[in-house]
């Protein structure tokens, strides 16, 4: 069983208690904030699960969370279970049975928990079915990632696969069209691509982009057109920003097609 961690932040803590309250064992609330409109419902949720609620000073919560960004609440809870290759297979089988188009987000070597959290948040907002990451060289779902995700970490299925390239082959064999973002001569503008069917979108780190083997597995490479400004131009975006732009285009097309 995974060791309990200290999660923090109003939305992250509320999501854990709402989605999997039995995984939590203790709640710390900053002294003087018990009756805050955002904190009182959290205490009420904790009470329904018989979770110990302790009042503590701000500095004590900062020490527990290892961050001053706790917003007055810290929750001791087991980390959310992460899916594996078998869960991905089950997801694909379920999608075929339902005949519902799926939208998957694949993150290749995203090691910053802040970027992972931001991507999870955007994925929930844009209707992503699941987020897939490799088992190695990727950020885990840390309390910091959960805080940045503002509750999305407990809403979005996260699947960790042993080998990302092999998982991509599996997706393609199951009829999923795989797009990868890259600055490449063969890449097409994002808006020129059909993102309305069973689609997987692969995002790489802002430093190195997607790996060569990952790029080779993609059905089509795409890029986000950037025009720059009078002040100059840049060649890349933060991965969470780029992910938001890519997922928005997918969401826009799928809404227009009434998917």
Briefly describe each language-model feature range.
Residues 70-74, 147-152, 196-199:
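Short, hinge-like loop/turn segments at secondary-structure boundaries
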Residues 57, 78, 108, 134-135, ...:
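Short beta->alpha connector loops at strand-helix junctions that form conserved
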Residues 140, 147-152, 216-259:
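Structured adenosyl-cofactor binding patch, chiefly the S-adenosyl-L-methionine
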Residues 1-94:
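N-terminal positively charged helical leader segments and presequences
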Residues 11, 18, 22, 37-38, ...:
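RNA substrate-binding interface of SAM-dependent RNA methyltransferases
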Residues 33, 79-81, 184-186, 206-208:
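Short glycine-rich anion-binding loops that position phosphate/pyrophosphate groups of nucleotides
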């Amino acid at each position: 069983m995974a060791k309990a961690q200290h999660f923090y932040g109003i939305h992250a803590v509320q999501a854990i208690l709402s989605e999997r309250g039995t995984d939590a064992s203790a709640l710390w609330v900053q002294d003087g904030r018990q009756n805050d409109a955002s904190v009182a419902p959290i205490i009420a949720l904790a009470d329904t699960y018989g979770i110990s609620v302790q009042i503590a000073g701000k500095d004590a919560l900062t020490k527990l969370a290892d961050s001053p960004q706790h917003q007055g609440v810290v929750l001791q809870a087991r980390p959310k279970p992460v899916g594996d290759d078998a869960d991905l297979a089950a997801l694909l089988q379920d999608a075929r049975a339902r005949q519902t188009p799926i939208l998957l987000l694949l993150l290749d070597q995203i090691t910053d928990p802040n970027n992972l959290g931001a991507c999870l948040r955007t994925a929930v907002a844009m209707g992503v079915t699941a987020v897939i990451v490799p088992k190695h060289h990727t950020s885990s779902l840390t309390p910091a990632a959960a805080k940045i995700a503002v509750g999305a970490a407990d809403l979005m299925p996260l699947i960790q696969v042993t080998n990302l390239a092999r998982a991509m082959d599996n997706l393609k064999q199951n009829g999923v069209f795989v797009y990868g973002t890259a600055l490449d001569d063969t890449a097409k503008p994002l808006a020129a691509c059909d993102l309305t069917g069973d689609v997987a979108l692969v995002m790489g780190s802002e430093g190195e982009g997607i790996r060569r083997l990952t790029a080779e597995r993609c059905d089509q490479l795409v890029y986000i057109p950037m025009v720059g400004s009078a002040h100059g131009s840049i060649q890349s975006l933060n991965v969470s920003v780029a992910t938001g732009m890519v997922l928005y285009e997918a969401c826009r097309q799928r809404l227009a097609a009434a998917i």
